[in-house]
Amino acid sequence: MTNATGRRTTIGVIGKNEQHAGDPVDAATMQAAYEVGRLIAAKGGVVVTGGLGGVMKESSRGAKDAGGLTIAFLPSMDRDTANDYVDVVFTTGLGRARNLLTARGCDSLIMIGGGCGTLNELTIAYADGRPAVILQGSGGWSDKLEGVLYDGQYLDERRTVPVQFAKTPEEVVEKAFAAAKSGGRPGQHI
């Protein structure tokens, strides 16, 4: 599938990283991330992530299993930190500042679970006018945001771009592609 410019649609998948054995992502969230990646690839989209573990790894694995292309913006300069399912690796050496690249390197964003880093990526996308769809029931900030949004869909009073919600991997991917096709309003609110 192509975006508003005629290029392949890039969908960012953001969510919780598994940093160590004591910080796991639950099995249902991992399965949802896998399915989201698989569905994006099946529609001809490109999966963009931060390239590490957890949601990033599983969405990349799903995309690869469906024959898709995956891109990652790593926080470090070490290519070996990328998960095994990344095709195109960009080492940034930027630490968490790489969230700017992850959020801006896609036509729309899908949020699955997540902590403060994921929330940071979402707010960057929102501030830029880039559409985002949140998978409800996936834990973390994905399950907390709806109750605090302005009018149930905006991160602040500027009402830059609506944040959408979906209950299934199929619905979240459909909404993300539709949002990407509409073009959002990227770059208007930098």
Give the role of each language-model region.
Residues 174, 178-190:
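C-terminal amphipathic helix plus adjacent low-complexity
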Residues 6-26, 37-38, 43:
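Generic N-terminal amphipathic, Lys/Arg-enriched alpha-helix
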Residues 34-37, 169-174:
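Short, amphipathic alpha-helical "lid/cap" segments that border enzyme active or binding sites
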Residues 81-83, 151-159:
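Short, conserved catalytic or adaptor-binding loops enriched in Gly and charged residues
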Residues 4-5, 19, 30-39, 51-123, ...:
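Acidic/glycine-enriched connector segments
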Residues 124-152:
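Phosphate/ribose-phosphate-bearing ligand recognition and processing surfaces
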Residues 89-93, 160-172:
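Short acidic-hydrophobic, aromatic-tinged amphipathic segments that line or gate anion-handling sites
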